[in-house]
């Protein structure tokens, strides 16, 4: 059976650079060629972030490549895109990012019932020693798994 929410595009650096505190699902306002390009995995969330402007959420810095079969009415690659969310959730996000050290970052773009959704997160930036500790922990876990596997044979 196919996964309901398989990610079309994911921000793989997010979990390395940030500590994820809470995630939300949002809709996104897109043009037709943008949707087709995202379905072809033609988008990146590398330098993207979410900003609250006039009590609305905006995805800034998301690069969606031109649709290769598009015509002269193709979309602009690096435009700001509006995110759709309930007002109480927007207020919660706005309050969280006003707190020192917290940010709103996009984690993934995925399909849900034929519509493209954005998974965003309230996150706290990691310091370099936190990143090193995470890498060491992951390395230790991997070595333990390999040792257990060797013991079984």
UniProtKB/Swiss-Prot annotation:
Gene3D superfamilies: 2.40.280.10. PROSITE patterns: SSRP (PS01317). Residues 133-153 are annotated as: Disordered. Residues 133-143 have a biased composition (Basic and acidic residues). GO terms for molecular function: RNA binding. The keyword Signal does not apply. One of its GO terms (biological process) is trans-translation. Residues 144-153 have a biased composition (Low complexity). InterPro entries: SmpB, SsrA-bd_prot, SsrA-bd_prot_CS. Its main location: cytoplasm. It is found in: Cytoplasm. Keywords: Cytoplasm, RNA-binding. GO terms for cellular component: cytosol. It comes from the Bacteria. Belongs to the SmpB family. Required for rescue of stalled ribosomes mediated by trans-translation. Binds to transfer-messenger RNA (tmRNA), required for stable association of tmRNA with ribosomes. tmRNA and SmpB together mimic tRNA shape, replacing the anticodon stem-loop with SmpB. tmRNA is encoded by the ssrA gene; the 2 termini fold to resemble tRNA(Ala) and it encodes a 'tag peptide', a short internal open reading frame. During trans-translation Ala-aminoacylated tmRNA acts like a tRNA, entering the A-site of stalled ribosomes, displacing the stalled mRNA. This is SsrA-binding protein. It comes from Protochlamydia amoebophila (strain UWE25).
